[in-house]
Amino acid sequence: MGTEAGSAPVVRGRGLKVHHLRPAPGAHKSKIRVGRGEGSKGKTAGRGTKGSKARKQVPARFEGGQMPLHMRLPKLKGFRNRFRVEYQVVNVATLAELFPQGGEVTKADLAARGAVRGKSPVKVLGNGDINVALHVSADAFSASAKEKIAAAGGSVTQS
């Protein structure tokens, strides 16, 4: 076992072990303890004399008497309804593209084809044209979507 200049002890022949590791010299500086005796950083501990800065901490949000940021910004208007139901939208034109042969269409079918995701409610809107008879089951329908699906020979089921 020997040491090389300025490094941790090296164990010869037995490999490096965790308990032999040491930080590099000068890597860890000791914390300066302030206000302990008459030396540097003693007595007033580098805070000067008197005043609120010497007696206690000034709040982090304090801007030196300037109008604070939270008072300079405008107030937010309105509110956000926590109970609002956010629908995933599918148009009748999309239904006609995804199901050209017609038939039964459910939320699971739409999710399988990538038109909607997961468990959020689905609303069918009447944008576009439809010419196949579809029997659509969804959470909500617009009036124009109901008309177009019925006109094409299909039916609507609200689940």
UniProtKB/Swiss-Prot annotation:
Residues 21-34 have a biased composition (Basic residues). Residues 21-55 are annotated as: Disordered. One of its GO terms (cellular component) is cytosolic large ribosomal subunit. The keyword Protein transport does not apply. Coiled coil: none annotated. InterPro entries: Ribosomal_uL15, Ribosomal_uL15/eL18, Ribosomal_uL15/eL18_sf, Ribosomal_uL15_bac-type, Ribosomal_uL15_CS. Keywords: Ribonucleoprotein, Ribosomal protein, RNA-binding, rRNA-binding. GO terms for biological process: translation. It comes from the Bacteria. One of its GO terms (molecular function) is structural constituent of ribosome. HAMAP family: Ribosomal_uL15. Part of the 50S ribosomal subunit. Belongs to the universal ribosomal protein uL15 family. Binds to the 23S rRNA. This is Large ribosomal subunit protein uL15. It comes from Frankia casuarinae (strain DSM 45818 / CECT 9043 / HFP020203 / CcI3). The gene is rplO.
